[in-house]
Structures are given as C-alpha cells and as structure tokens.
C-alpha cells in the first residue's frame, strides 16, 4: 500500500561503499541506510511532510562513516554546520518531471522506517526447550583419589518447573565432596544434578588392647608386671635348709635348739588359730615365708643373744594379729648369702634363714 504523503527520492553518485541518510526525520540518529542500484549509485525514497509552504526538510549523508552534505541539493549553514534541505517546491518539481526512478527496495525501506529491521529474538525462542535433570552417583576411591560414575539417571522435567532451579541441599564432609547434592544449570536449559556419595571400603576396625605386660627376670622366667615377685619353691627351700644345717655343724648349742623347740610348741596352737581368720585367696604360701635373724658378732665368747621376731598375718583377727616367737641362737659370723624378695609384704625380712624353724613351721601349717 502506497502512502498518501508526498515522497521524495534522495540520491548519491556511485563510489562509496555505504551511505546512510539522516536528518530531522530521525533526530539525526543515522538509522536509514541508502540502497545501492545496479549502476553503483545510491538512492532511497521516503515520504516527507512540511508544516507550511515555507518550511524546510533538513537532511545529511553519512558516507563511509563521514558526515557530508551533497552538492546536488541546497545547503544551509547554521553556526558553521552545513546541512542539505528541500522545500515543498522541490518535491512538486521532482514529481512533475518524473525524473526519479523508484527502487523497490528503497521505497519499502522508506515506508517502513519505524518497523524494526532485525528479527526479534522472541521468535527464535518460540519453541520451548525440553528440560532434563541428570542424577549421577559418583564414587571416589580414597586411596587413589580416582572418581568414577557409579550410576546415572536422566529425568525429563515437566513444563511447570522453573528453568532456573537452584540448589536446596548443601553439605560437606572431610573430603569436601562426599554427601553433597548439586544441581548445575547449563546454557541449553538442561539441569544436571550430581549426587556425590562417599566410597567407603569396609575395612575391619582393629582395636589394639594392651594386655597385661610381662617381664623376664634374670633366670629366664616370665612373670606378670603387676606381680613381679620372686617365690621360692619347696625344693629350693629344702636345699637352703640343708646348706644352713651344714654351716651350723657341731658349733650349735644344744640349749638353743631345745629352747627353740619349746617356743615352737607354745606357739603351735595360736598360729593354727590365726590361720583360720585368713581368707583362702590371701593366705601366705609356706614356701614364700622368709625369716631374717640379726646376728651379733660383738663377742665370740659363745654367749647366746636373744632376739625377738614378730610375724604378722596378712588379715588376721585383732587378737591374733601379732605373734612373738623367741629363738635363741649362737652369735657367730654367718655365711654371706643373697636374700630374695617375698610376695608377702607383711613378713619381715632378715639376711639369714633358720632352716630348722622353717621345716617345722611347714609341717605345722600343713
């Protein structure tokens, strides 16, 4: 449909690569490119309006980026700026002469000057994008750090779901990735959800329990560290008694042995009674009882020194807590021997042993 407004054809001779027409009709924005004809010249036809017969239509050409007026049209100089213009008479004169040859492309551009020249992007996006959600389970080898896809699931989302779905689940472990679910949106409208689970190898947990420590003594025997006590066996005790008997020889006073036997007979009954009050698990073994007699070698005149030794049971009754056994012994230098420790801490320790006493005491306790 051709416009009822008067039209005018603007021309520029051939030579330039591109020419744009601008003026008061587009507020000098340079939005109307001219059309190049087969001869290489540029022209464009567009409707023009005048408010009064004396009004002017101002315009200018942009030739390869430069603002230039044309010598084929009238020129107006305003504050040093040159612009072309036409009047209503120029439009009537061009129409009467019929000298203007309309180019179909130029006419179409002139009439549709307000129409957008670029196809809107909305038409390109008219087709809806299909949305998918990808669920991946990735397992990580903690030893090598290698990550591999354990399973993958693709789910198509309905149209009701928003394309810009965000992450609602957050979480983080020692390794930085385990136990998290992440949804990543790419440029093509596909939502990708990565569910990362830890790759745990079922290793049996080994709990190291420190058992009771054991130590080895100088004799090669292994004993508990909680009860590191040395006990004498019955055979060792008998050997020591025999050695002591040999050392004593004939120098032992007969009166001393008689007095010792009398004192042992007197204490026989109290010792047996006191043993009844002891707990079975806390009885002192016979083989572990050691007596220590102090010997005085002040005067080797054969005088007898009397010493009192006190033996206390471990947990006896108050009445039988301490019993006294008196033994008379000749004062003479004894054979130096090493002493051994006993497990019963309540028994007093002496550097020497009386063999006859232990032998009879063992018989009494049996």
Curated annotation (Swiss-Prot):
The modification Phosphothreonine is found at residue 216. Residues 159-180, 217-366 are annotated as: Disordered. It is found in: Cell membrane. GO terms for cellular component: cytoplasm; nucleotide-activated protein kinase complex; nucleus; plasma membrane. InterPro entries: AMPK1_CBM, CRP1_MDG1_kinase, Ig-like_fold, Ig_E-set. One of its GO terms (biological process) is signal transduction. The modification Phosphoserine is found at residues 160, 288. There is a cross-link at residue 314 (Glycyl lysine isopeptide (Lys-Gly) (interchain with G-Cter in ubiquitin)). Residues 265-284 have a biased composition (Basic and acidic residues). The keyword Membrane applies. Signal peptide: none annotated. Keywords: Cell membrane, Isopeptide bond, Membrane, Phosphoprotein, Ubl conjugation. Its main location: membrane. It is a peripheral membrane protein. The keyword Repressor does not apply. Residues 233-247 have a biased composition (Acidic residues). One of its GO terms (molecular function) is protein kinase binding. Belongs to the CRP1/MDG1 family. PANTHER family: 5'-AMP-ACTIVATED PROTEIN KINASE , BETA SUBUNIT, CRUCIFORM DNA-RECOGNIZING PROTEIN 1-RELATED. Involved in G-protein mediated signal transduction and in the regulation of polarized cell growth in pheromone-induced cells. This is Signal transduction protein MDG1. It comes from Saccharomyces cerevisiae (strain YJM789) (Baker's yeast). The gene is MDG1.
